[in-house]
């Protein structure tokens, strides 16, 4: 297993994981875990070969003060505080997989992750906003 650790001042150096399917999103204590599986089959580089050499990646976001999710569908949205209401989050994403399509860092250094929901769900997409103090990539 290969580790990459990014402190808050190095977040812009991270790989953004565009167009990768997240097979699991969970939160434990003050840590958000996102797992990407079959990376060596999904994203193809310019040379026609898989972009990622590793098969699996788990990203561990160590949360400093907050982590929330906004689910979107046409004219409505739903807000969930992941640190307080993670059961509500699990109920909304039950049985789904997600396509990661955007990653942003705002002017305060906070992380914003955008995902499309791939299965039939009452919401189309969601964004996770958080104040992370450290991010750890676990490549397998």
Per-segment meaning from a language model:
Residues 1-140:
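Surface-exposed, interaction-prone regions used to assemble/regulate multi-protein complexes
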